Amino acid sequence: MRVLIFHGYLLRGTGSNVYNTSLARALVALGHEVHLLCQDRHAGELDFVDAVGTWKGGALRVDVIRDPVRCTAYLPPIGDVLPVYVADAYEGFTARTFPELSDAELARYLAANAGAVREVADRVRPDVALANHLIAGPAVLARGLGGRVPYAVKIHGSALEYVVRPHRERFLELAREGLAGAGGVLVGSRHTGESLWEVMDDPELPARTRLGPPGVDVHSFRPRPAAEAGERLRALAGRLEGADTAGWGGEAGASEALRDLSPEIEPIVGYVGKLIVSKGVDLLLAAWPLVAAEVPSARLVIVGFGTYRDTLARLAEALGAGDLATAREIAARGRELEGGPPGELTYLAAFLDGLEGEARERYVSAAAGAFGGLRFTGRLEHGDLPDLLPSFLAQVVPSTFPESFGMVAVEAAACGALPLSASHSGLAEVTRTLEPAVEAEVAPLLSFERGPGAVEEIARNLTAWLGLPAERREAARAALSERSRELYGWEGVAQGVIAAAQGRLEGLPQPRP
């Protein structure tokens, strides 16, 4: 079967990029022919991409890398402006959020992509197609395919929550145009489905909506003994050494940061994801002195990139120096420090304001030595994570903003790391699927409530997990891994996408409470 996918962004990093890379790879493994429209100028470096199509000089040219061609990546000629959902930097592009685009810029972007889809479809005659993102993939396919090819839509949280919801007057009709012709609409969680239904206000949409969460590569993401995890971590550090890690989202010291970690002798806690305010990494940093006071050997590693990276480093420095006034200022300014409007980080502020008397003194004392082992790695490729995550005893997912699905939590669990996630939206739904794998006393450690007590709860859960007797913790790690491998796999995701595009919804799970 020939499958056309419109993504429109990169094929590495986090979130929807990883979803589309993994989906395309799974489709190829299942024997399908994939035609993937993206904006990754290094797409040809991926092992499953066999040809790359570009429009240099205005005409489509396809350069074959290897035969047989199973997957072709196409880069539509959109120019230098890349519309995004959250302000960030993208190498080679001027990134602008969709609301910042002029009407003319938006029209040019849509026309360029729809034209590319039309030309590719005329050339390869796809059997089914998939549009990603509520804005603007579905409308691009609706215009480019002109009703000739059945398609599904995959909803990712950012376009819905950051663009359509707050700017309905401008983007709602564009979203409706794209959804109207879809055979099925896939959401990662019940939470995302309900949010979509509310925003779209279409009484017929729930009947076409099905669960279609991301998956995990169960062959790559798996537990490793501590010695092997250490070897793989050092091998990853070696690969990064001398590489151009200081490019888009990377950091020059990534290799040294990873080489400094020793899972054989120290418990490692990690965060993997974008470094933006809504991901809640400030809560993890504030919790860390409380963890370090109980488990002095524990190490914290932050993996990712984003506009809030420097502020997070400044927050850690302020906490480590006992400068709670600066930490409180950071909490007060909030999103302003990543280029957005001022707005207090209320959960961080609540924690800092609650530190008084002896509790404040104990916290300042603990923080003084807590951050010496903190390491920032910058962006790592998704393909690097199977060599990183088995070295973690826990991975924290502290997002304060709704998430459509907790893919990072699933991948962490598959590797035997405790996936400690905020208890809301798609993260909570993932946690509910994993909790039955572990004993009753361990299950509450998988989540924390988003609220004024978040910092203390993160610290309590991490401390309790790291303090478990080794045999109980290892049994729980093995059970979490087995559970995630049973429930999530990319081959099933790929088959669900094809079924949704064809309108065969009866066999796909509905988003239920």
Spans of model-derived segments:
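Acidic donor-binding loop of glycosyltransferase active sites
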Residues: 183, 352-353, 370-373, 390-404
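A charged, aromatic-enriched C-terminal amphipathic alpha-helix characteristic of glycosyltransferases
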Residues: 15, 452-457, 467-501
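Carbohydrate-associated surface elements
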Residues: 191, 212-215
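Membrane-proximal helix-turn-helix segments that form the acceptor-binding/catalytic region
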Residues: 168-185
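A conserved catalytic-core segment of Leloir-type glycosyltransferases
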Residues: 35-124, 319, 328-376
